Amino acid sequence: MNNARPIRRALLSVSDKTGILEFAQALHAQGVELLSTGGTARLLADNGVPVIEVSDYTGHPEIMDGRVKTLHPKVHGGILARRGIDEIVMEQNNIKPIDLVAVNLYPFAATVAAEGCTLADAIENIDIGGPTMVRSTAKNHKDTTIIVNANDYGRVIAEMQANQGSTTLETRFDLAIAAFEHTAAYDGMIANYFGTKVPAHSKDECHEDSKFPRTYNTQLVKKQDLRYGENSHQTAAFYVDTHLDEASVATAVQLQGKALSYNNIADTDSALECVKEFDEPACVIVKHANPCGVAIGENLLEAYNRAFQTDPTSAFGGIIAFNGELDAATASAIVERQFVEVIIAPKVSQAARDVIAAKANVRVLECGQWASKTTSLDYKRVNGGLLLQDRDQGMVGIDDVKVVSKRQPTASEMKDLMFCWKVAKFVKSNAIVYAKNSMTIGVGAGQMSRVYSAKVAGIKAADEGLEVQDSVMASDAFFPFRDGIDAAAEAGISCIIQPGGSIRDEEIIAAADEHGMAMVFTGMRHFRH
């Protein structure tokens, strides 16, 4: 059975005019009759492309300031007509078949993102006729072709040129899927926006918009199927949010290496987000979602060497992230010293790429340089639901902390405290981090009691022959008892940074004073589960 359908009449009505003129010219060259509306029709006519206004075709003018343009039986009848079935009805009602529709919708997302956008502004940018045409055409994809993305114009023209002016069912079905995805995302954005306005029309005029709508809609696009999930008996895929434009594992370009695994992606995300916290040349090495070595250096090579020194054993098979351009010297040091799963950096020099190319399995990602932090949400799946929260972008500086001990931290201790606090934010709770001279000395992660995390950090440092004496310690949450302070003092810690807020804070501070330690409170917790 021949599933090719010729394109003889097309309706073009787009908000984003990118590529539409060239597309219309190509359709006209193939003998396609063009219908259009408003600004799109004017653009085509002004450039010499023959076009029929939809209002002339329907015999009904655009009304209500353009709110009603294409909602007419001659439009939707022409789109929805089943070829070989509805011809008599079409003839009785003077309806002509419309074989292709190219539509993109009012820019609702851009409108509501603009500063000063009102509810009235948002309402006027809710497209009605566009989504209706899109859904009608997609529903009847057996006979009609829908395009919602300008990137598909060339594809359709190429197929028409190769098939005597026709499109194939395979292409029409693929485009129909894209169309339904498009309208679903569009309606989801509108529902989310309106959901944050509850109760916009209540009697209580004093209310703030909610960040969390009463129903939450999102659309993620599959980037790749994964070999398996967290474990080999689990299937998995990687989906990305195409609306977020920031340097991330989701937007990174893979330059070489084997396909990323589920665990690679999760660990790379942890490493990259951690290294973003630092302005100086920095390196973060992650294993099983926890930093096992973090350091700052005069350059990336020094930062890597120092980060690796923290825990060479755990660094084996780890993920390495940098906050600057990866150079050949640093790349050489990595591949000569250790087995590495993934290397990610804002940029990778050609010389570095040439060095790593000898290790064909090493995955190398280039994510681009990041700017300011982007506001977004974190998701956590629970059985039967989804937890949403602000992404933890909180961070304190020297001017934000409060010294609560008798002894003041020295300038070098305070610098290490700030470094250590940034690392602790990315260690699984209960998190304890030892650091000295902007380098992690020991990391205690994921213990059920805070004192044991402190002990683990000390054990890790001792195992690697690192000197803990006069190091600083960060704790992601307050100490419920003084035992964690005592353990730190026994290990040689000189200064502690922690949120504070325990009912036993006075006892904790007294313990620090007893050991001659300095202690600062941040007033901010960084649990990570």
Curated annotation (Swiss-Prot):
Its EC number is 2.1.2.3, 3.5.4.10. CDD domains: IMPCH. Pathway: Purine metabolism; IMP biosynthesis via de novo pathway; 5-formamido-1-(5-phospho-D-ribosyl)imidazole-4-carboxamide from 5-amino-1-(5-phospho-D-ribosyl)imidazole-4-carboxamide (10-formyl THF route): step 1/1; Purine metabolism; IMP biosynthesis via de novo pathway; IMP from 5-formamido-1-(5-phospho-D-ribosyl)imidazole-4-carboxamide: step 1/1. It catalyses: (6R)-10-formyltetrahydrofolate + 5-amino-1-(5-phospho-beta-D-ribosyl)imidazole-4-carboxamide = 5-formamido-1-(5-phospho-D-ribosyl)imidazole-4-carboxamide + (6S)-5,6,7,8-tetrahydrofolate; IMP + H2O = 5-formamido-1-(5-phospho-D-ribosyl)imidazole-4-carboxamide. One of its GO terms (biological process) is 'de novo' IMP biosynthetic process. It comes from the Bacteria. GO terms for molecular function: IMP cyclohydrolase activity; phosphoribosylaminoimidazolecarboxamide formyltransferase activity. Residues 1-148 form the MGS-like domain. GO terms for cellular component: cytosol. InterPro entries: AICAR_Tfase_dup_dom_sf (IPR024051), Cytidine_deaminase-like (IPR016193), MGS-like_dom (IPR011607), MGS-like_dom_sf (IPR036914), PurH-like (IPR002695). PROSITE patterns: MGS. Gene3D superfamilies: 3.40.140.20, Methylglyoxal synthase-like domain. Pfam families: AICARFT_IMPCHas, MGS. Keywords: Hydrolase, Multifunctional enzyme, Purine biosynthesis, Transferase. The IMP cyclohydrolase activity resides in the N-terminal region. Belongs to the PurH family. This is Bifunctional purine biosynthesis protein PurH.
